[in-house]
């Protein structure tokens, strides 16, 4: 298993409960596919460097995970489809 850092930005206009459900759903996508979540950081609502889909702010989440590539690919696929995640990036950490 390799270490990855995943950062994603959620729409700022979501209700708090829906936001928590989204975070939990995407954490479950990783764990159900064999990943182990090491650390989760909520950066909270921050201003974006530039507008994305007419939004100026976003709710930032950062995950550090030990994972196989399949779990990360599934997360990436679902994050691209989901309209509540406005941006995401997956970085493989150096060993």
Curated annotation (Swiss-Prot):
MF-aspect GO terms: small ribosomal subunit rRNA binding; structural constituent of ribosome
PROSITE patterns reported in the protein's UniProt record: RIBOSOMAL_S6
Any one of the GO CC terms: cytoplasm
Entry's transmembrane regions: none
GO biological process: translation
InterPro entries: Ribosomal_bS6, Ribosomal_bS6_CS, Ribosomal_bS6_sf, Ribosomal_S6_plastid/chlpt, Transl_elong_EF1B/ribsomal_bS6
Keywords: Ribonucleoprotein, Ribosomal protein, RNA-binding, rRNA-binding
Superkingdom to which the source organism belongs: Bacteria
NCBIfam families referenced in this protein's UniProt entry, alphabetically: S6
Described function: Binds together with bS18 to 16S ribosomal RNA.
Family of this protein: Belongs to the bacterial ribosomal protein bS6 family.
Protein name as catalogued: Small ribosomal subunit protein bS6
């Amino acid at each position: 298993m390799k270490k990855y850092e995943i950062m994603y930005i959620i729409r700022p206009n979501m209700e708090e409960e829906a936001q928590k459900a989204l975070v939990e759903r995407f954490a479950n996508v990783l764990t159900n596919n064999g990943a182990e979540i090491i650390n989760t950081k909520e950066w909270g609502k921050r201003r974006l460097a530039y507008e994305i889909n007419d939004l100026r702010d976003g709710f930032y989440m950062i995950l550090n995970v030990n994972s196989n590539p399949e779990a990360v690919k599934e997360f990436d696929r679902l994050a691209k489809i989901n309209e509540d995640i406005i941006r995401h990036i997956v970085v493989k950490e150096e060993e």
